[in-house]
Amino acid sequence: MITDVQLAIFSNVLGVFLFLLVVAYHYINANTGKPSAKAK
């Protein structure tokens, strides 16, 4: 059975991974914008 400590570590690692995934998505999305969109 999974313990409270293992569950806490798993949820923290999952949370950090998802946060970094969102940050990476926004970074990539902001730096690969269309040139025509920047001209407006």
Curated annotation (Swiss-Prot):
Protein family according to the UniProt entry: Belongs to the OST4 family.
Superkingdom of this protein's organism: Eukaryota
Self-association and partners: Component of the oligosaccharyltransferase (OST) complex.
Annotated transmembrane regions: 5-25
Topology class, membrane: Single-pass type III membrane protein
GO cellular component: oligosaccharyltransferase complex
GO biological process, one term: protein N-linked glycosylation via asparagine
Name the record gives this protein: Dolichyl-diphosphooligosaccharide--protein glycosyltransferase subunit 4
The protein's role, per its UniProt record: Subunit of the oligosaccharyl transferase (OST) complex that catalyzes the initial transfer of a defined glycan (Glc(3)Man(9)GlcNAc(2) in eukaryotes) from the lipid carrier dolichol-pyrophosphate to an asparagine residue within an Asn-X-Ser/Thr consensus motif in nascent polypeptide chains, the first step in protein N-glycosylation. N-glycosylation occurs cotranslationally and the complex associates with the Sec61 complex at the channel-forming translocon complex that mediates protein translocation across the endoplasmic reticulum (ER). All subunits are required for a maximal enzyme activity.
Record's subcellular location: Endoplasmic reticulum membrane
Segments on the Cytoplasmic side according to the record's topology features: 26-40
Lumenal side: 1-4
tRNA processing in keyword set: no
Assigned keywords, A-Z: Endoplasmic reticulum, Membrane, Signal-anchor, Transmembrane, Transmembrane helix
InterPro entries hit by this protein: Oligosaccaryltransferase, OST4, Ost4p_sf
Keyword Iron annotated: no
